[in-house]
């Protein structure tokens, strides 16, 4: 996520064999790579995982990854704004695949969907990302930048986004808009919302309206279910009816998946 490291061991049956979340802010440095490698080895030991059966390591980052997976081309949420070689990969002693976090999240969501139809994926976390899968194939675009939903313009001339432009969806619907603006953690925000805090309620109402506008636009372009993931998604179930009503108000023909 840029602020912490999440390790998960998964087998080919999609069963989670181990999970751990650690505070490790991302740095594109050899020292970070060595620290990452040490934590990986400790994780394997802690869960008694057989290294001889380890097929490889998948790493995801909130940014645009070069086609050869050796560089980060653009990732404003981790302060990378031009193509930068990945200096942290060299210390990992296993086959590694590096990819965009939303692309991986989208593929995981598609894999677990019944029928496995085409779908869009909207990731609402520290940043806002997306993915589009057409019949199971990830559409990446000519420059591997497709489905960057977080940087479509929601409000021209509006809030400044981390990318430098104004009005991007990320500036309105990232997790930071719910937590940072009020000086709360995401968990604390929703706890206060549940307890009837007026400021949190106003922020959340605006958030849902902006999210509905984004969902309507994505659906209008791609004409497929839109699946919501990321750290905010775990808090959405109680508000699905309200969100669906806002979407229908904007576009009565839109049918959203969530």
For the regions a language model picked out, list residue spans one by one.
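N-terminal helix-turn-helix/winged-helix DNA-binding helices
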Residues: 1-3
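Conserved hydrophobic/aromatic positions in well-ordered beta-strands
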Residues: 6-10, 131
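Short, ordered coil/turn segments that flank beta-strands lining enzyme active or ligand-binding pockets
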Residues: 12-13, 68, 134-135
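Glycine-rich phosphate-binding loop and adjoining helix at the ATP-binding site
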Residues: 16-120, 238-253
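Glycine/GP-enriched mid-protein hinge/lid loop-to-helix segment characteristic of carbohydrate kinases
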Residues: 18-22, 27-32, 86, 94-199
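Adenine-nucleotide phosphate-binding core of ATP-dependent small-molecule kinases
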Residues: 30-50, 169-171, 177-237
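Short secondary-structure boundary segments
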Residues: 61, 124-126, 230-231
């Amino acid at each position: 996520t840029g602020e912490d490291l999440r390790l998960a061991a998964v087998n080919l049956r999609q069963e989670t064999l181990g999970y751990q979340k650690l505070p490790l802010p991302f740095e594109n440095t050899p020292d970070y790579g060595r620290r990452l490698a040490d934590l990986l080895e400790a994780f394997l030991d802690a869960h008694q995982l057989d290294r001889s059966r380890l097929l490889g390591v998948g790493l995801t980052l909130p940014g645009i990854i070069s086609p050869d997976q050796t560089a980060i081309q653009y990732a404003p949420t981790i302060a990378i704004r031009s193509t930068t070689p990945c200096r942290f990969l060299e210390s990992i002693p296993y086959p590694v695949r590096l990819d965009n976090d939303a692309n991986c999240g989208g593929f995981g969501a598609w894999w677990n969907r019944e029928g496995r139809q085409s779908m869009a994926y909207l990731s609402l976390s520290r940043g806002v990302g997306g993915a589009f899968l057409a019949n199971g194939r990830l559409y990446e675009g000519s420059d591997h930048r497709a489905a960057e939903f977080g940087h479509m313009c929601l409000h021209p001339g509006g809030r400044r986004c981390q990318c430098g432009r104004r009005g991007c969806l990320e500036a309105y619907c990232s997790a930071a808009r719910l937590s940072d603006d009020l000086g709360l953690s995401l968990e604390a925000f929703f706890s206060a919302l549940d307890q009837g805090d007026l400021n949190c309620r106003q922020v959340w109402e605006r958030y849902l309206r902006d999210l509905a506008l984004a969902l309507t636009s994505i659906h209008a372009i791609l004409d497929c279910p839109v699946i919501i993931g990321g750290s905010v998604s775990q808090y959405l179930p109680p508000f699905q009816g309200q969100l669906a009503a806002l979407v229908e108000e904007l576009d009565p023909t839109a049918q959203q998946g969530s």
